[in-house]
Amino acid sequence: MGRPPLAERSPYDRDRVVDVAVKVFTERGYDGTSMADIARALGVHKSSIYHHIAGKEQLLEDAVKRALNALHGMLGEPGATEGPSLDRLRYVVRRTVEIMVRQLPEVTVLLRIRGNTATERWAIARRREFDRAVQRIVAAAIAEGDLRSDIDTALVTRLIFGMSNSVTEWYQPGGRLSARDIAGAIDTVVFEGLRRRP
């Protein structure tokens, strides 16, 4: 069946175009997606998309900004900035998982980029800034005596995010586990293993 006539098509805006692009990126990969694929998923002519965005890389930028802005924004929340460093770290880990679940498609796109374009390199740099901010909290928790000091802070941060980031590969929205369940399990596994023993 062909495309519906223009008059019958539902209206769409930039956010809708980005939503659909994210879905196609997660299915086909960024490099494997063309503007024609996105237009087809929207049910419009490819030229119509250019009224909203400059091109595929702009769609990628908008998509990863959603995830990055949420993650960086969370670092400014009171739970991430106030109190003992261990409490702040636990808050950051839990909120990271919540953000990953809430923005699963955008986070999935963010975690799959490889640095092939200027936008991808920018996103990777921003992701590393986030990782370094968390690493500083890990170091502070060690300095305060709440975490073991025999494990490298960069390694601890990588292990925490390795576990957290895996959520994008197996989490099923509407499934048996909520974001809170997953965050709680990660919190227990990570912090019971890292806690300094008396």
Question: What is each model feature region?
Answer:
Residues S10, V18, L60, V64, ...:
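Amphipathic, non-transmembrane alpha-helical scaffold segments
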Residues E27-D31, E82, Q103, E144:
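Short coil/turn segments at alpha/beta junctions that flank glycine-rich nucleotide-binding fingerprints
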Residues D62, G76-R102, T157-I160:
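Hydrophobic alpha-helical connector segments
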Residues V107-R112, E120-I124, R128, I142-V189, ...:
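Hydrophobic/aromatic-rich alpha-helical bundle segments in the mid-to-C-terminal region
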